[in-house]
Amino acid sequence: MEIILAEPRGFCAGVKRAVDILAITLEKYKNERQVYVLHEIVHNKYIVEDFKKQGVVFVSSIKEIEDNGGILIFSAHGVSKNIEDEAKRKGIQVIDATCPLVNKVHKEAKRYENSGKELILIGHENHPEVKGIRGRVNNPITLVQTLQDVYDLKVKDPDNLSYVTQTTLSIDDTRDIIAALKLRFPGITGPDLKDICYATQNRQNAVKKLAEIVDMVLVVGSKNSSNSNRLLDLCTARGKRAYLIDNYRCVNKSWFQGVEKIGITAGASAPDILVDELMDYLKVSMNVEVSVMPGGIIENVQFKIPNLV
């Protein structure tokens, strides 16, 4: 049996930055102040549970933190302006681990609003990134999730529209939605696909190629990870069996019956250790040969850690 690894896979620069910020902050203050994270630092069960064991407290609301208490880290997904303001009012020291590419979308949304545009957001309801983007502007943003949403869309002025997008969407689906928006509202302005982050694009392009040359794909990532779910969707859309797994313990050996080539990829919030453990498990469980998919992109993007850390 042959295992082919997607390239690239796993951590993106924004996730690595957020995880590093939390690790450095914890090391610096663990004996002095409680470290909190609003929501999950990234959408990966292993990462969150590991930091919990080290003493990090994950909260769903700033109300759970006492005034002037501890250090609060905003997750990679970003937060609304109201949450920032609430933390200031409570005297909580904040370290912002928002991905710089998400911050870019925040600035775009604000710029469009300041120019008087009615805003449309392409994204997934209730995703923390979407909540953060919506909370960066004063006026309501209309959320579009599907092509049907575009057809049903009602706007104030069809000649005065702009859109932004969540960074972790399906490139193919987003391209179709943008095309539908431009067809229905020819005057609409927006960033094309540029707001879909480089890592999301690279991992989706890689898994498309991977799905063409294997019989089955294992996607390492958590169920609440948007980008991991998109990788799964791309495989199944191409008629390939695919499974989203947190770790090697989720593997069912019956999946491999009749399979000669297994593809493995990992979402942008899945650490290398989970892929390594999966590989070790498969090597012990069955006779496998391992290779890396040819022609993959080697990423070298790095984001700066804030000076406050």
Curated annotation (Swiss-Prot):
Its cofactor is [4Fe-4S] cluster. CDD domains: lytB_ispH. Coiled coil: none annotated. (2E)-4-hydroxy-3-methylbut-2-enyl diphosphate binds at residues 43, 77, 127, 167, 225-227, 269. It catalyses: isopentenyl diphosphate + 2 oxidized [2Fe-2S]-[ferredoxin] + H2O = (2E)-4-hydroxy-3-methylbut-2-enyl diphosphate + 2 reduced [2Fe-2S]-[ferredoxin] + 2 H(+); dimethylallyl diphosphate + 2 oxidized [2Fe-2S]-[ferredoxin] + H2O = (2E)-4-hydroxy-3-methylbut-2-enyl diphosphate + 2 reduced [2Fe-2S]-[ferredoxin] + 2 H(+). Binds 1 [4Fe-4S] cluster per subunit. [4Fe-4S] cluster binds at residues 12, 99, 197. Keywords: 4Fe-4S, Iron, Iron-sulfur, Isoprene biosynthesis, Metal-binding, Oxidoreductase. GO terms for molecular function: 4 iron, 4 sulfur cluster binding; 4-hydroxy-3-methylbut-2-enyl diphosphate reductase activity; metal ion binding. Its EC number is 1.17.7.4. Dimethylallyl diphosphate binds at residues 43, 77, 127, 225-227, 269. Isopentenyl diphosphate binds at residues 43, 77, 127, 225-227, 269. Transmembrane segments: none annotated. Pathway: Isoprenoid biosynthesis; dimethylallyl diphosphate biosynthesis; dimethylallyl diphosphate from (2E)-4-hydroxy-3-methylbutenyl diphosphate: step 1/1; Isoprenoid biosynthesis; isopentenyl diphosphate biosynthesis via DXP pathway; isopentenyl diphosphate from 1-deoxy-D-xylulose 5-phosphate: step 6/6. One of its GO terms (biological process) is dimethylallyl diphosphate biosynthetic process. The active site is at 129 (proton donor). Catalyzes the conversion of 1-hydroxy-2-methyl-2-(E)-butenyl 4-diphosphate (HMBPP) into a mixture of isopentenyl diphosphate (IPP) and dimethylallyl diphosphate (DMAPP). Acts in the terminal step of the DOXP/MEP pathway for isoprenoid precursor biosynthesis. Belongs to the IspH family. This is 4-hydroxy-3-methylbut-2-enyl diphosphate reductase. It comes from Wolbachia sp. subsp. Drosophila simulans (strain wRi). The lineage of its organism: Bacteria, Pseudomonadati, Pseudomonadota, Alphaproteobacteria, Rickettsiales. The gene is ispH.
